[in-house]
């Protein structure tokens, strides 16, 4: 496969989910209009918020929306409710799957493989689970995946817990999985930091999708 150009954005600051989601949608629409436009990758952290997929069950929010102290967004992706916060690294991929494989199951499994390679770079043994989407360390979930797709142009992506406040997941039923335990990478490798993980995420995506990155 020939290399494809992708714009990559890696802010150092903690970013608003609303602003980054709007940016993704803009790149998605640009690719739909003209697939010669570059793909778009965003790697960073969010302020504390909760997001629900298109068909999410609000019963999986364990707090009232009427007096919520947190931002809650319903967005264009599959899957159930999840949480974003500082200390968790989020990666969004706005890709034209027509250049790769027009198969969403292939894409989900590809993302799982990418996450497993990222954690493997830090000597963390992890795995996918049959019947579920995401990546686990033993019986604890370390990474969540949620994607949207319109005319084969993807949106959203995956999150990896690096060193975040896992208590925030207690306010939801994560990914709709009852009694789901969550994990942080830092608990399995004390020497890592989020900037180093970010570097490996970029490198792995670049290699797996044959991208030539343009920083922006």
From Swiss-Prot:
**For this UniProt entry, which segments traverse the membrane?**
none
- Cite a single GO BP annotation: protein modification process
General remark: In the reaction, the free carboxyl group of octanoic acid is attached via an amide linkage to the epsilon-amino group of a specific lysine residue of lipoyl domains of lipoate-dependent enzymes.
Q: Which GO terms describe its molecular function?
A: lipoyl(octanoyl) transferase activity
Which EC number(s) does the record attach to this protein? Answer: 2.3.1.181
Keywords recorded for this protein, A-Z = Acyltransferase, Cytoplasm, Transferase
Q: What is this protein called?
A: Octanoyltransferase
Which residues make up the binding site for substrate? Answer: 77-84, 144-146, 157-159
Record-annotated site: Lowers pKa of active site Cys? 141
Task: Please give the catalytic activity noted in the UniProt record.
Answer: octanoyl-[ACP] + L-lysyl-[protein] = N(6)-octanoyl-L-lysyl-[protein] + holo-[ACP] + H(+)
Note the coiled coil stretches, chain numbering. none
Pfam families associated with the record: LplA-B_cat
Location in the cell reads:
Cytoplasm
Q: Which gene encodes it?
A: lipB
């Amino acid at each position: 496969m020939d290399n494809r150009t992708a714009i990559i954005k890696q802010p150092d600051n903690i970013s608003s989910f609303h602003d980054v989601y709007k940016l993704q949608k803009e790149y998605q629409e640009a690719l739909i209009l003209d697939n010669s436009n570059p793909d778009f990758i965003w790697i960073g952290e969010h302020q504390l918020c909760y997001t629900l997929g298109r068909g999410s069950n609000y019963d999986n929010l364990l707090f009232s929306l009427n007096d919520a102290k947190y931002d809650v967004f319903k967005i264009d992706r599959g899957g159930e409710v999840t949480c974003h916060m500082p200390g968790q690294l989020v990666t969004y991929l706005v890709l034209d799957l027509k250049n790769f494989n027009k198969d969403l199951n292939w894409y989900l499994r590809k993302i799982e493989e990418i996450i497993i390679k990222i954690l493997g770079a830090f000597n963390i043994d992890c795995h996918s689970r049959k019947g579920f989407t995401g990546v686990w360390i033993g019986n604890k979930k370390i990474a969540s995946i949620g994607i949207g797709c319109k005319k084969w142009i993807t949106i959203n992506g995956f999150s990896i817990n690096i060193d975040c406040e896992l208590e925030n997941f207690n306010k939801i039923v994560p990914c709709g999985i009852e009694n789901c335990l969550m994990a942080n990478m830092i608990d399995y490798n004390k020497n890592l930091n989020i900037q180093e993980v970010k570097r490996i995420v970029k490198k792995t995506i670049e290699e797996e999708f044959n991208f030539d990155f343009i920083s922006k």
